[in-house]
Amino acid sequence: MTRILTACKVVKTLKSGFGFANVTTKRQWDFSRPGIRLLSVKAKTAHIVLEDGTKMKGYSFGHPSSVAGEVVFNTGLGGYPEALTDPAYKGQILTMANPIIGNGGAPDTTARDELGLNKYMESDGIKVAGLLVLNYSNDYNHWLATKSLGQWLQEEKVPAIYGVDTRMLTKIIRDKGTMLGKIEFEGQSVDFVDPNKQNLIAEVSTKDVKVFGKGNPTKVVAVDCGIKNNVIRLLVKRGAEVHLVPWNHDFTQMEYDGLLIAGGPGNPALAQPLIQNVKKILESDRKEPLFGISTGNIITGLAAGAKSYKMSMANRGQNQPVLNITNRQAFITAQNHGYALDNTLPAGWKPLFVNVNDQTNEGIMHESKPFFAVQFHPEVSPGPTDTEYLFDSFFSLIKKGKGTTITSVLPKPALVASRVEVSKVLILGSGGLSIGQAGEFDYSGSQAVKAMKEENVKTVLMNPNIASVQTNEVGLKQADAVYFLPITPQFVTEVIKAERPDGLILGMGGQTALNCGVELFKRGVLKEYGVKVLGTSVESIMATEDRQLFSDKLNEINEKIAPSFAVESMEDALKAADTIGYPVMIRSAYALGGLGSGICPNKETLIDLGTKAFAMTNQILVERSVTGWKEIEYEVVRDADDNCVTVCNMENVDAMGVHTGDSVVVAPAQTLSNAEFQMLRRTSVNVVRHLGIVGECNIQFALHPTSMEYCIIEVNARLSRSSALASKATGYPLAFIAAKIALGIPLPEIKNVVSGKTSACFEPSLDYMVTKIPRWDLDRFHGTSSRIGSSMKSVGEVMAIGRTFEESFQKALRMCHPSVDGFTPRLPMNKEWPANLDLKKELSEPSSTRIYAIAKALENNMSLDEIVRLTSIDKWFLYKMRDILNMDKTLKGLNSDSVTEETLRKAKEIGFSDKQISKCLGLTEAQTRELRLKKNIHPWVKQIDTLAAEYPSVTNYLYVTYNGQEHDIKFDEHGIMVLGCGPYHIGSSVEFDWCAVSSIRTLRQLGKKTVVVNCNPETVSTDFDECDKLYFEELSLERILDIYHQEACNGCIISVGGQIPNNLAVPLYKNGVKIMGTSPLQIDRAEDRSIFSAVLDELKVAQAPWKAVNTLNEALEFANSVGYPCLLRPSYVLSGSAMNVVFSEDEMKRFLEEATRVSQEHPVVLTKFVEGAREVEMDAVGKEGRVISHAISEHVEDAGVHSGDATLMLPTQTISQGAIEKVKDATRKIAKAFAISGPFNVQFLVKGNDVLVIECNLRASRSFPFVSKTLGVDFIDVATKVMIGESIDEKRLPTLEQPIIPSDYVAIKAPMFSWPRLRDADPILRCEMASTGEVACFGEGIHTAFLKAMLSTGFKIPQKGILIGIQQSFRPRFLGVAEQLHNEGFKLFATEATSDWLNANNVPATPVAWPSQEGQNPSLSSIRKLIRDGSIDLVINLPNNNTKFVHDNYVIRRTAVDSGIALLTNFQVTKLFAEAVQKSRTVDSKSLFHYRQYSAGKAA
């Protein structure tokens, strides 16, 4: 029977796709569906028919004529105009693996260069017989484009169809070998034709002799076997007078300085006249150099006496790695051949190059004569230019004269690597998460440890981030020793002394590790202790970090950077700006995430930003602003053998002026021509080589949108956020490979772990596209603008994978915010646009909501040209965004009866969710899902394999798409699903990734198959070797159900990923998903604060007076009855979103409005706020209502500070035993009442012996990693075993009856804040969480542990003066603290009233003026001046709600933060700090394992 596959169709870009039931490997089905009208003229249907009977339907965008030929595929990521005009494709129907073709339109096909050759093409026209693509972009945009790709194909009468699952087609060709095929239109039947039986070389060769570069000194005869124009250009450029002769021309009697044979298509063995002519040359006495390219390699080999064969799988693409056998140098090459030489080379000849992947011949050379040939294309176009140097070698042979061999003129390798002999390596982590330095370093550090262990190298890890996976002390993938200590030169030196490592890795710990390593180098510590920095040298790091050195280095190789000056004073900065001209950009040296950077349109802005920058660094760069240019990034890997690959290139949708961490980013780049792509790639490689990078680095470019002008912005000589994104986008494990390279292992010897077969020395091909969208939480920070710029503000990000931009873009928007349906003019969290919205300003000034403003502008019919003018976003992206809104409008005009299958399918293919569609059609989400499934529309599961299906893959790295026709995998494992945490944001950070990874690892240790779903590229849980199947997908009801049912999972764990998966518990349960652990109905009861409080009353468990309120009047009545302050809490939220302590009626009105918006479906609970109480955390694991593991930790701060911002102590330090017993008893009752089986957390207020419950979360909490590591019991391991019904030995667990309480050490967990990045935010703690990360350290007592933890957050112990500003009510308690600080030798400053009070109580203090009163009293110094000149290096600012000087206190806090000065705003923390400084004069470098060893020794 005939096998027919209906093609995918995709919106305006002419696409449409159809999902089908599970397919069998035999592909025995027959589907046929009508196309839909998308353009003004309905696209004609056509079929691609293969000789094995496979028939796939598509839609025409070329010439509507049938054609037959050989079907081949190309995995290149760009350069389709060059590829289509490559004569080597003569007679072939080309399948493009790149999922979107036509973005850049077609260039001027009549334009000629100075040689008379077609300027933008590789021959005189399109040479492919036909073209097959998945998605065709009819809307195009490029400054060189003159028409669409479809118009060009029609002009040249070449058929082309879109809507074919090209990945599926590639797999058929890969598995069965290249095969004959035909594109057939109805009524135009054609027979199969085998072009390999034709002498295609004769068809494409010139018919006459032609001369190019007439008068040039070197005469080169070029035999045209289908030569590409670029070969001629490169020869003339080097001084050749090129005589282009037909393939059968007798050149044996011609005089020449060099002979070149290049091409071409078909079977070279059919070109017998040419082979005989070459044979005459080889056997004659002629010694002029001969250079063969592609077909020329086989022609030369056949002439020499070797044999050729047709390859089962041709090499066609732009990422083929070849190895020079003579010197082990590897190169990435462009290839296009289906025949190869075998290993029958005669005497006198030997191989020159070999393919690293399939070991086929890639070049030959004569051992004594100047004859050589290569199978790949050194002239490229399209493709990488790595081997263009072979043309130089050819000319060197010509100049050297006769009798020279190619090896004598090939460039020698710059480096020859040797294995770095190290036995123990110290890896520096990045510390707690902060804006600009987040969870990506947990991922990279974990990969580095894994790589070292594979090579039998011992590892010592130093990282105080206790929530990270890498700091686990037990496990096959963990370091041999873990130090929870500050990443500072002092502590690293102590660890080096104690551990005596012989190697040090700096590139896996972000800017923190890099800066620390540079300082250790400068101090001579590394030299003193014989520690080698592995990978990139410190000198190279300094050259990338020091702005002047960086500029000098690039000038050495004449590379393009923006005109700039590195300055070390504000005066010089102003002079530099005057020289360059405004606007200018400033950047700080040794800074992270654009900290200390900004665009300065004028002198005033420069003074403001420059002053703040100099507070953080001693050097800034003032450079020309390239705002509005495109921002392009490359991730480059270089080994110690000087082999270089560019693993991924990425394009920022937002133009220059927005930090890449705050930009929407796509991979691969979508709007670059081949010339632009390769220009920037070549520059990347040159720069990385010149800087001496060994390992991985990121290079960022600004590219002019309408010319080839570019400049280098910066190089990061380390793993970065972009590196993590590139790793997850491509499947190429950059950190793992970089760690191997650091040991001196060359790239060709490292395996590609995804394919399991090929080498890591390659550049991934993507047959999908990725969109990254940042996650901001700017609303949490009072006073912070939503504007974004060159200094990063986002706290996390998501990555979505699709096969159209629209699909991945809409998925990413939903991943970022569960409240967002897709690309829509509605703001996240259902917020309203302001009534006085200035839409043009919203577009021209980038902000965290600009993407929604673009949707609003499109909805308002603003022209694309106007949006381009205001945003500088490439028009191609805006076309796609417009297509989404057009579909939205179409759907809104339909209902469930009138919506056709084609329209519904098209909506799904461009990323519409069921929920999104339901709102348009007036249905529920469940009804839309039912409608979709009824129409047999469902998604397909595809693999990320790094190779665009070119090689069979063992990968378990998956995504879901509606743009396909088959699944890539089988679904026969029925694993347990684990839901990850989604994007990092305030309140959900790396601790939930730790929980997910712990659960996954436990399941695998128990022999259970795992299916993980997450969408965060910074996580370890999205490392594909952590689980059995990884779905990089949305954490939405729709997508989880899709995957759960497709995989037929045995259950789903939702309690280890934080609030996002927890919120899905009830909806999943109602849709038949088996939720492991505590019943979702119980979770719902606990999450609804009013129900939970009612249950506590029934249990007679004490809590503060409370009331669930639905109206403002109810809230005001309750507050008046119990008295202010009150605590206002919405339900189903994480990290205290919209939670506030309310002190007045006005605040109640304001906060209640916000709370109802955050949690609209649930009532808000008001509780009487208990002042002066201490908060206690109970982290526990329940088993069928019994508590089998628990840990009790105490907050340093009194209640009122969110638990995520609190400083935790374990064991408790001030809580009475009586209160602890009450905490345990309440926990016991709650566990039983809610029948808890799994992890949970209860928060209590303790005041004396009174214990009140605050709230309970029936899921893992952010303190689980902290308590697990401190007590040495993995609570998530225990919880996972409970949830799946595994038996547990409870004797070793910290039960309520037999707690584990450390007696020889104290653990302190401290929060990390990112205030310097959040310009204008008030750095003070409230009920709503503000911290971005956490650290933990250990000490024999609370004081040493506390100081280590504070130092780990970047806190600097003051050396000079302390500014004290306290509200009057704090005075009685604060006097003792002030005395302690004075006795420790600190000079105290205070505002007038506080100063008078301190002096009156015999504590000397210098009075200073409030900021608002500066200059009024000449005898009072300016606080801001004292802070900025370093006289004050700690600010203690303790206001409360009754403070009069609200704004002054804010200015003081903000000045401290902006000046890089330590700031304390909580009395209890200040008190503990004063005690710690007094009692711990020195801080040791002991960590957890030291204390554990001591405890074990005592017990023994």
UniProtKB/Swiss-Prot annotation:
Residue runs in coiled coils: none
Subcellular location: Mitochondrion; Nucleus, Nucleolus; Cell membrane
Binding site for N-acetyl-L-glutamate: 1391, 1394, 1410, 1437, 1440, 1449
Modified residues (N6-acetyllysine): 44, 55, 57, 119, 157, 171, 182, 197, 207, 210, 214, 219, 228, 279-280, 287, 307, 310, 412, 453, 458, 522, 527, 532, 553, 560, 575, 603, 612, 630, 751, 757, 772, 793, 811, 831, 840-841, 856, 875, 889, 892, 908, 915, 919, 935, 1074, 1100, 1168, 1183, 1222, 1232, 1269, 1291, 1356, 1444, 1471, 1479, 1486
Domain ATP-grasp: 551-743, 1093-1284
GO molecular function (one): calcium ion binding
Predominant place of localization: mitochondrion
Anthranilate phosphoribosyltransferase homolog: region residues: 39-218
Top-level lineage group: Eukaryota
Swiss-Prot/TrEMBL domain comment: The type-1 glutamine amidotransferase domain is defective.
Role this protein plays: Involved in the urea cycle of ureotelic animals where the enzyme plays an important role in removing excess ammonia from the cell.
Protein name listed in UniProt: Carbamoyl-phosphate synthase [ammonia], mitochondrial
Source organism of this protein record: Mus musculus
